[in-house]
C-alpha cells in the first residue's frame, strides 16, 4: 500500500510468519504466469515485462490464444532450452540427454522441433486457458490480500477491543503471563493530601523502592509532574515541596527499624510511623508506632517506655496535637508535645486511657470481624471532630456472638510457641462470627470530651433494639453535630439521626422503609459527604450529600440543613444510576463530581452537576466512545485536580488534570476534553502493555444483551448483559465448547467495558474455548427492580438466568451444546453449584466451585439477612437457596469443589455439609481439593497457582471427554 511505500503489485516481505510455504509457491507461480503475460503484452504491442492488471480485457486475451498455440510459453529465447517444471528463469535449463530420452520415449506422441518433443496443440490450448483463469483468480486474490492489509503481520495493528475477526498470526498468551501480572495495567498511586491551610493539589509521594537519591516521604505540588513550567508556577511548586521523612529506616535506642506505614499530621510537622506491621483480617493490622518530628527527624515511641507495644489503630487529631489509638481493644488519648521525653515515667502525663473494660469480647474504636468485613469496610471505628474537641467511637459487645474455630495445621499466625508436647497440634483461632439468625454484636456510639475528660452516649427515642440495630455511618456534620445512619438488622428500615454532641441530645430526622417501597434493602455506603455552610457561596446552612433510592435507582440528594428530610435531587435518572458517589465536591464552585452509567450500565463516565439546584449536568470524559473511568480528586476544599483513570475498553491510561477547566471544556461541547486542559499530565500510558497487545493473539470480545424469559415465581422477562470471549482465530463453522464464568452476587457487576486479560482471556485465546460472562438479575446498575427480585431467595433467580444463558448459547450454530461448563469463586461458587443443581444435567455438563457458600445459614448475619431476612422469618427461602439436592447434582457429568481450610469468611463447613449430603445419597461424580491454612483468597503455600492449574487441567479433561470415560469405569479387558 502507498502508506507503506510499496507498489501495490509488489509483495511485502513477510514479518514473522508461522510458515513461508504459501509465499514460495505464490512467487513461483507468479513468475511462470508473468512469462505468459509478457508474451501477451508483447503481441499486443505493450511494454515487455509489465504485469497483468486485474480486470484486463479478457476478450482480447482470448483472441490471442490461437496465436499462442504454436509457441511454448516456457521457452528461453536465448538458449532455446525448455523445462516444463520450472522454466529457464529458475535455472532449470534442459539437459540434452533428458530431452533426447523424452523424445525417444514419446515417439509418435507428437512432433519434435530441434530435438525437442512438440506439445500437442489441443493440450497446449487447454493449459493456456487454465493458466489464464488461474492468473485472473490469483491476481484477484492478491488484490483482496493487499486491500485488507493481509500482508501485514498482526503486530502492526493497534489492539482493537471491538475486533470481531483475527488479526493474523500472533503469539499466544500464557498462563504464566496471566499469573505474574504481565497483562496487568500499570497503575500509579497518588495519595492526595490537603495542605496545612487547606491548599489544593498536593500529594504525598512514598519512595517505596528505597531509591537512595530520594527521600522516603515527601509532599509535592501536583504541577511538579509537568515539565516546562513558567517561572511563577515553578516558584509556587518549589514552595510547596517539603520532605517529611528522609529515610525508610530509623534508629531508636540502638535498634534500627524499617518503616511499614506512615501517617502525616494535618500540619505536616509530625509523622506517625508504623513498624513490624502484622495483618489481622481483610483491612485490619497491628503495628508498633513511633512519632517523628519532621524538623529534627527524631523519633519517640507512641507509648513511652513500650517500644514494642502492639497497637491496632492510631489516628491524628485535626489539630495535629494528639493521637487517638486502640490497644488491646481499649481506646487511649495521647497528647503530642514537641520535645517530650520517651521514658516510661512520662507515659501517665501524656496518655489518658479512655476505656478500661475492652478485651476479647468488647471492642472500642475498632470494629469486630463482621463490622470490618460487612459494615465499615475498614479498620477504624474512631472519628475525631473537626475541631479536635470530641472523639466519637463505636463500642462493640460480642458477648452473645457464637465462636467459629479456624484451624491452622502448618503455621501459627499468632506467633506464639506451642506448649511443650503440643507441637503437633493445630493452632485454633476462635472467631466471634455471627451466622444468619444468630446473636449479632451489640453496637452503640459513644463520645469522649477531650476538654472535660469524660465519655458519654446519647439516647435517641425510637431507636432500634440492641439485637436489631446496625450502625452503618458516622459523619461529623460540623464541630458539634454528628450524622448517624442506622438500620434494622435485615437492612429494610433506615433512620438518620443527628446528634448534638455539645448538648448531649439527638433526634431522628429521617426514616425510610425501603422494604415497603420496593421490597428491597439498603446497601451500606461510606460516601455520605458533609457540606459546610458558606453564605458567601449561597449555602446558608450546613448540609450533607447522600445516595438515596429514587426513580428505580441510586441517586444523589442534597439535604440542607441536616435536619431537613426533603432533599434537593442532584441526579434523577431514571434509566441510569450513580456509582459509589459522590466522587468529590468542589466547595468553592458548588460543583459535585460523580461517576454514573448514563451511557450504559457497562460504562462509567465522570460528570459534574451544580450543588445548589442539581442543574448543569456535564461530562468530564469523552462520552462519544465507550469507556470505563475512575477518578480520585485532590483533598483541598476546591477539589481542583483529579487523577482520571481510563480503564477500557482500550489500553488503560492515567492522567492528572485540573477540574474547573475540564468542566468548562465539557460544557462547551469539546470533543476531546483532555486536550483543552491548561494542566494535563499523562501519569501512565501503559505503552508497554499496548505493545504486548499488538504482538499477542488476544480473544475476540463480543458484548451485548440477550432476552431472558420470566421466572415462574413472579419474575418477569428481562435483558441480561453478557461478554463473550472468542478464540482469536474464531471459525463460525466450527463447534466450540463454552465456559461460563460469573460472580452473580447482589449489586455486583462482571460485564463491563474494562480492559482485562485474565484467566478467562487465556482460556479463550490459548485453549481455544468460548468463554461467556453473564450478569444475572440481582446484580448491579440495571435498576432497583432488577436487583430486588432476588430478595428472600438467593440463588433461585440467578441460576434460572444462567440456565437460560446456557440454553441460548447452546442454540448458536458455532457452539457444542454437549460441552458447557460453569465456574465461580465465593458467591460465584455458590451460583455454580445452585445452577448445576437446578439444571440437573439438562444443559450444563460440568462445573467448578471455589470457596462456595452451600447454605446461607452458614454465612454471616449482616450480609445474608440483608438479602434473605432471618432464617426464623424466611425458613422456606433458606431451604430453597441451600444446595442440597444431591440426586440433581448426580445428573451432571462431573463437578469440582475447591476450598481453603482456614477460610474465615466462607467457612469450610459449607463444602463439608454438601459433601456429607453427597455421601448420604451415594453421589460420586465430583472431585475435591482442599488447601491447608489458606483463607478465602487461597494463597498459602502456592495455593492460588494450584487453583488455576487444577481449574485448567480439569476443564481440558472435561471438554476432551475424559470424565465421560470414568463415569462407568471397568477393568481393562472387561469392556
Curated annotation (Swiss-Prot):
Segments crossing the lipid bilayer: 126-146
Topology in the lipid bilayer: Single-pass type II membrane protein
Record-stated family: Belongs to the peptidase S9B family.
The organism's taxonomic lineage, starting at the top: Eukaryota, Fungi, Dikarya, Ascomycota, Pezizomycotina
This protein's name: Probable dipeptidyl-aminopeptidase B
Active site: 826, 903, 936
GO-annotated cellular components: fungal-type vacuole membrane; plasma membrane
Gene Ontology BP term (one): proteolysis
Protein purpose: Type IV dipeptidyl-peptidase which removes N-terminal dipeptides sequentially from polypeptides having unsubstituted N-termini provided that the penultimate residue is proline.
Chain positions covered by the region annotation Disordered: 1-111
Known catalytic reactions: Release of an N-terminal dipeptide, Xaa-Yaa-|-Zaa-, from a polypeptide, preferentially when Yaa is Pro, provided Zaa is neither Pro nor hydroxyproline
